[in-house]
Amino acid sequence: MLSERQREAIAVAVDRGYYEIPRQMSHEDVAAAVDCAPSTAAEHLRKAESKLLQSVVGD
């Protein structure tokens, strides 16, 4: 379902508090952790979130 990079980015985000309120890290921090550009990390997160939500909610 998720690409390896999407899975890696979302795992880091969940593990390090990206989805906590308030956030414990930014997408820039996710990018640094997975060694990619911030815009790429944001794209990985958005695509992973979309795929995961579609699997829960359906089409």
Predicted features, each with a name:
Residues M1-D59:
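Acidic, polar-rich N-terminal leader regions of halophilic archaeal proteins
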